[in-house]
Amino acid sequence: MKKLKFNVEAIIGDRYESTDLLSKNEVHNWLVNIQKQDILKVETENDYWEDIPQDLFELLKTNIEDKNYNYTMAKGHLWLEMEILLEP
């Protein structure tokens, strides 16, 4: 199996009333309910998506539900880093 590192940028909360102060649980609860339109882009070492394929979105959601990610926040933007095991 191969691990692939994903970087995800999303808008969290209201675009006009952005927040930078959410607890880990608040961030996780928001991520569990994330919609495709909340994600601005997804990057790997070799690929880039602004319009995320449904299969990739489901893979990201599974990783989020498993709490397999690190994140940073600033001005209503959330940056996720996650590694996903890919089957050959």
Predicted regions and their residues:
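Generic N-terminal leader/processing signal
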Residues: M1-K3, L22, L59, M73
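Short intrinsically disordered terminal tails
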Residues: M1-K5, L85-P88
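Short aromatic-glycine-(Arg/Gly/Cys) micro-motifs in beta-strand/loop hairpins
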Residues: K2-D14
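Compositionally biased regions
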Residues: V8, T19-D20, K24, Y69, ...
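Polar/charged side chains located within well-ordered beta-strands of beta-rich proteins
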Residues: E9, E17-S18, Q35, N63
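A short, exposed loop/beta-hairpin motif centered on an aromatic-Gly-Thr core
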Residues: I12-S23, N46-W49
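Short, surface-exposed linear segments at secondary-structure transitions and domain or protein termini
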Residues: N25-Q35
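Short, mixed-charge low-complexity intrinsically disordered segments
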Residues: Q37-P88
